[in-house]
Amino acid sequence: MSRRIAFLGCLFLLGLTAWAQMRNLEGKVTDESRQALAGVMVRVYAGNRLLGFTTSGRNGQYRLRFASAGQDTLTVAFSKLNYEAFRRRLSPADRRLDATLRRGERRLREVVVKAPPVRTQGDTVLYQLKSFLQSGDHTLEDGLKRIPGIQVDESGKVSYMGRDISQFYIEGMNLLGGRYSLATKNIPSDKVTGVEVLRHHQANKVDRRDLTDNVALNIRLSPKAKLKPFGTYEARLGHRSDGVLYGAGGTGMLFRKDFQMLATLKLSNDGRMGRNELNVHFKGADWSSEAERALPLLAGSQPSMSETRYQTSRNEMASLNALRKLKNGNEWRLNVNYSHRRSGHDYAVLTKYPDTQGQDITVSEQADFRQMEHLADLDLKFRSDRDTRLIENSLTAHGRFAEANAAVLNADVAHQERQQMDAFGLRNALSMVYRRERWKLNFGSTVQYVGMPDNALDFLQDSVGASRQRAYGHHFYTEETFYTGYQLLPALTLALPVKLMAKANRLQTRWQGDTLAVNALQGWDGTLSASPQLEYQTAGRRFRATLAVPLTLIAQHYRNTARDLAVQAQKFCADWWLEMIYVPSGQVEWRATSRQQHGFGDIADLLTAPIQTDYRTISVRSGVLGQYRIMSADLSYSWQEPLSFWHFTAQAGYNRRFSSVVRGQQVSSDDVALLEVARPHTADAVTAEASLSKYILSLKTRLSMDGAYGWQQNRSWSQDRFVTTYGSHYTVGGRFSTNPIEPLQAEWRLAYQQNRLRGNGTDSRFGSWSQQWRVAYTLWSAWRMEVSGEWQRNSLPGGGDSQSFSFLDAALEYKFRKPKLRLRLELNNLLNVRSYRYTVYSQLNTYVYRYGLNGREFLLTVTL
């Protein structure tokens, strides 16, 4: 442990060393008439190496911070369109350099202006999307994947330099909120001119002076896309071993200066059309309830591969989104979303549970899972954003109706499980912020209700002996916040945030036919916290530090009338939180956080009667309100050179958790009991990761490398004894994509992961190789041929047989010029791989899975 702490300390000291080598330069740029020049590019070079850059503001002033060794010979270059370039050598003592630019004397009869691929203005980096697109990039999401520093994961979530974006704008307007995949997957790439990366972004004008580490994206559309409505429409037809595949859908869009609208309707059974488009990528309302957490919907286990490989699914989705911009910073937004999904998959699993006698308890199962879900949301939002005040209110309605079925064969005994779950909710969130001279006031109020009138799980064994487990209840929640801050000095603010939270719950669980297996919970809890804090920020928004001391008072009053159990408690705790953000230049950013946080159990701890969560698993709580304390520290560093397309990020963190309750399991050949035991214990975790990428514009080539390390120590309860386990892993990988000549395109990803698990009488090491590749070639600007593959190999501990699988896909595409039509024939899983086997090692148990996969499929898509 001391070595890991020393490692973090060294990383921190390296950061301090880097800060000590920074140098400042400022000045003013004017023309020959002594008028200020804005938009002049100022660059500092050490030889041919670029150290830093910036642009002059409206008043001609510029300020630049860069890293330099004392022996460097430095040159400052000033450049602006229609002006002669100006260069000057910088001496070690220079801290200010003014420049006068002369207009260019040469006049060209005919000038062709080509926009640069990337431009910077302060904290904003603007990428010209066309410069990075490759053949076959049809949607905005395809284009975002090409931009240096931007990543898009399997779910559609967008991040920049490893940090998830906090806002997504289209022409400066937030139409979709967290469901921005509706835009990235449906806006054609040829309708987009630029992508703006807004670093240190503040969504509210009233807070624009505060430095943050948030990142946002703003999509710039072409002039034609803003003149009239446009859309994309597609239909598909295909075949797979389980039947005919189909899909049809369309998306219409309108983006005006004061009004935006996006509407989509799609239905399919191929598992791809509309997939992940309604995912919410920002943190929002939590619609789960205690009844759902006590009896979650049957889902089964899922492998570490794309769900299109192993799931059969049928999807219908509809979405209507509109935003009306009014005068004085006011706007109304309406988002209505509905989805219906049916999915299924099957697998066989061999589970090994450790026993105290040194013998494993082994259970073999064959499972077939099916799910159906209706999900609907309506959100009406008003926002008034001005320089000195913000008013925002959001009213949301939510409904979810789901069913799940599982057929499990265990020791030649057939088990049927059928579950039905209905839930609905209503939420209103109000926020008001005022800033006047040195004062800042913030008031927020959130009220939410979630009801689950029905959550029933039925069990049948060999089609007889039906029994039922139910869990239903109601949940009410309110949170009131008040923040007041006063600016003591230009750089120092004293603030006092106050928060009042209250929850009221009613929860019942009942095992049909057993009057002893009943829980009848009701109660409430309240939290009052005040967090005196100091906020320090330099005038140039280069450094910001916040130190807070949360003081919290908690009152809890719970009863389980069916178990004659009641708990009343009042607790007080004091914590601390420290955050620092340092931006020495436009290329470098440091962020450090450290905190201590207390937490306490809730009403669910009184679920002392067993709850049957599947045919062989029961869950029992201790009846004791648990307590925990978390101490954590994180340090992150990011560096970028947007003009030369270099990006680097690194992060390290440590987490320690003290808890009064240990969770674990008690296993027999027939049942698995998930339980809690009151006993103090400590868990530790260390993480570190880094990533480096480079984009070569002339070759349209992107290279990246990344690595990660993790270590953890945990305690759990198993078979009437405490077990301590230690786990560690590291991952290294690389990515390569290139479009060196217009017709040829290639991509390749390679990753290796090594895991080690010690404890509970075992010491296992196992690794995994994976790679993905794709090659495409375009002929005569109309035909496009594509071949792609996926391969994974898992090595087992003890020299056991390795487990591997391979997929091969192909596609042929033809693009018409008039009408603007595209035909695409896909041939997926050409090798007709029908099963996938892999092994998972958890903290206590071992699982050996064999999943059934979708067979070879053919799919023809027409896109307009």
What are these regions (language model features)?
Residues G451-P453, I554-H557, G586-M631, Y654-D670, ...:
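Surface-exposed extracellular loop regions of Gram-negative outer-membrane beta-barrel proteins
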Residues R49-Q61:
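Short, acidic Ser/Thr/Gly-rich low-complexity loop/linker segments typical of extracellular
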Residues A20-Q21, K28, R34, N59-R63, ...:
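Membrane-proximal, glycine/serine-rich, low-complexity loop/turn segments characteristic
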Residues T731-Q754, S764-L864:
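Conserved C-terminal beta-signal and adjacent last beta-strands/turns
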Residues A46-R49, T73-R89:
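A short, solvent-exposed loop/turn motif at the edges and junctions
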Residues L323-R341, R370-L409, A414-T561, C573-W576, ...:
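Face-selective signature of the C-terminal outer-membrane beta-barrel domain
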Residues E32-A46:
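Short, ordered, surface-exposed loop/turn motifs in non-cytosolic proteins
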